[in-house]
Amino acid sequence: MNSFDKLLTKPTSEIQEDVKGLFEKFNLRDNPFPSEPFVNKDANDDRINGKIFEMEIRKKEYEQMVNNFLKIPRNDPSHLRMGFIMDTSYIGRGNGKSAFLINLHRKINEGFALDISNNINKSFSVYLSPEPGGRTKTFSQLIDLFFKSILDSSIIKNCLAAIRLDALLSLTPDFNPSKHFKDESDLIEKLNSTEWLNENKINPGMLNKKILENKYLISLPKEFPLYEIQGSLLTPEVVTQDHFKEHYLNLKKGQERLEFIFSHLVDFFLAANFNGAFVLVDDFERIPDFQSARQKRDFALELRNCLYDGLYKNAKMGFYTFILVLHAGVPRLIQEAWSDSGMENRVPITPSRTITKHIIPFEKLNREHAVSLLKRYLSEYRIKDNEKRGRNDELFPFTEEAVYKIAEVSELNASKILKLSYDLLDKASTINEQEKIDEKFVEEIIDKNIMDSETKKSIASAETTDLLKKAQGD
């Protein structure tokens, strides 16, 4: 072989060009189900970040949320300041509460609840989940997490842009936003930029002076970021969300931070034309699970003080509505503290015949819900429209009977249904002749898994011989 042969010689085994993707025979570009069905709001994979969600299976719960909370005028003194999404299925974790909450959070923020409430309310949503292992045990720690979630949502940045636009239109009535901004995101970025304002001959100092004439901002302390960071008329700068973060971190834990969150920020949000906010607290049990009886009572007392009976602006008007997700058993954990602190009189943790609007029962799914759930996931990963296959094509390659079986063995638990569907589809993709997933295939795979599991247990528990001791004659 000369020096050029290796460049021109072809291998004897050629690559097959007509090879199909692993799930292509099922008209899918990938396995649409999550391999580990745990929800992570910030993940890039839509299978686990909650974006693939069939709201129809939680239509009842969503309508209760809309009618009991989102549509009630915030100026109604009896509007609810706290609510519970309470698991009544008793099937353990994985009933879809987190996915529901994340989608509710996104739905509220899409139109700031203006569309949902027919312009009665303008509210934003903040989603948070207490840290595991007892790291969110005190009310102060929860509030730190709450403010972090506010920052992550960029709602302060949004409000700063809204307040500046309002002031700019007052100072310059002929200012046309559509000529300067491509869309909402562009507007928010530019109105939070000192450089852009200067380039367009808009003095940030004069703009800030106009902003501070807002009736909700006049009473704020002079340490509040809008007052503290103004810049001079010669070297002006805009206040950014980072200034709010720095200000909060410089406040002492306890009263100073509570005053900022439940009074000063409320006035700031009101100045940006919001009249309410929903604080969605997932996995609430992570807090009382690690609290002593006294810590539970102190936590409930502070909650009552900030939401109902204290002197904070929020307690007076009910700007924030806290929605707590409670797994089965959590009410029993906090019932005594709720009663001792007086919270039971404000927002009963125990359902009654007369006061139930603040409690949204989260019930077990049924077989039809399981069918709708699988259809939703499958539709997100279709390679092409497949209407010609017939009425039940949306479920392909699953049959309806197969889904009923999956739901049955999964105890109607959403996470288990999705995980089993993932495993079945993954297995079927490796069997050339397996063109569909029917009830028989489901039973065969389940039986095989049970046998494999029992074999592993048998091996693990089998009597063993210590060969070293045997060789030594022991």
Model-predicted segments: where are they?
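The catalytic "switch" region of P-loop NTPases
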Residues: 2-34, 60-64, 229, 233, ...
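A short, basic N-terminal segment
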Residues: 1-83, 176, 440-474
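Glycine- and acidic
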Residues: 83-86, 285-291, 405-407
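P-loop NTPase nucleotide-binding core
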Residues: 75-273, 465-468
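C-terminal alpha-helical "lid" subdomain
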Residues: 2-6, 364-372, 378-474
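Short, well-ordered amphipathic alpha-helices
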Residues: 64-70, 102-110, 303-308
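A short acidic (Asp/Glu
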Residues: 94-102, 137-143, 288-294, 331-338, ...
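Charge-rich, solvent-exposed alpha-helical interaction surfaces
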Residues: 18, 22, 65-68, 142-145, ...
